[in-house]
Regions:
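Short glycine-/polar-rich loops that comprise or flank the Walker A/P-loop
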Residues: 19, 97, 123-128, 174-179
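Conserved substrate/cofactor phosphate-moiety recognition/catalytic segment
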Residues: 34-97, 140
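Glycine-rich phosphate-binding loop used to anchor ATP phosphates in small-molecule kinases
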Residues: 78-127
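Conserved nucleotide-binding/hydrolysis micro-motifs of P-loop NTPases
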Residues: 62-64, 107-109, 133-138, 187-188
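Phosphate-binding P-loop
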Residues: 12-19, 94-96
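Conserved phosphate-donor/acceptor-positioning beta-strand/loop module used by diverse small-molecule
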Residues: 123-142
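N-terminal pre-Walker A segment at the start of P-loop NTPase domains
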Residues: 1-10
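Conserved GTP-binding G-domain of TRAFAC-class P-loop NTPases and closely related GTPase folds
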Residues: 21, 25, 30, 38, ...
Length: 199
């Protein structure tokens, strides 16, 4: 497992084997969607996964936009469950269909990582993690900027899980992943491309 530390000024391209599942994860508001928008030209109003250069780009906003008109009457926890289930199903379908996938995920729940790793193995490929590591204050500011704020108790749980996840990654102790790259905001800003032509 490779762990690339944050603040690496030369880290401009990330390269993975063809057909890999790359999961971009971080705290809510960390800037995951912003990074995908910049790298793949997403507008933010898509309702389905986007094909870009032979890669399926899957952001949870796509599932949220797909369901939006029908979810308004439902309570927030149920809306979140429906969107998350749809998002995970789309990731699994694309990976099992043999596509290279870059997917957005909050990913702080271990069972999600193990589940995605299992799906990748079924497809004969690997799970690779890109951790966008920002402090909670920056993530909270990102939530305010996008107009969707996670409730304080839930966000605190995210933060606890996130700290544990990053600590495990830096220690090389994330067995479900074939590789792990940790980026802070400046390093993410230098990233030019995520490629699927390595070995």
């Amino acid at each position: 497992m490779a762990v690339t530390p944050a603040c690496t000024p030369s880290l401009e391209d990330l390269t993975y084997p063809p057909g890999s599942l790359v999961v971009l994860t971080g705290l809510p508001g960390a800037g995951k969607s912003t990074l995908l928008d910049r790298l793949y030209g997403l507008r933010g109003d898509e309702t389905r996964p986007v094909s870009a250069g032979g890669v399926r780009v899957i952001d949870s906003r796509q599932s949220r936009s797909w369901w939006a008109p029908r979810l308004d009457p439902l309570p927030a926890p149920l809306r979140t469950l429906v969107v998350h289930a749809t998002h995970m199903a789309r990731i699994c379908r694309a990976v099992l269909g043999g596509h290279a996938v870059i997917a957005h995920s909050r990913g702080t729940w271990p069972h999600i990582l193990y589940g995605l790793a299992a799906v990748a193995r079924l497809a004969g490929t690997g799970l690779h993690l890109v951790l966008l590591d920002v402090d909670p204050e920056a993530a909270r500011a990102g939530q305010l900027a996008r107009g969707r704020v996670v409730a304080a108790p839930l966000f605190a749980r995210h933060c606890r899980r996130w700290r544990a996840l990053v600590a495990r990654a830096r220690a090389g102790a994330l067995p479900p992943a074939a590789s792990v790259t940790v980026l802070d905001r400046p390093a993410a800003g230098l990233l030019r491309a995520i490629r699927f032509d390595g070995r």
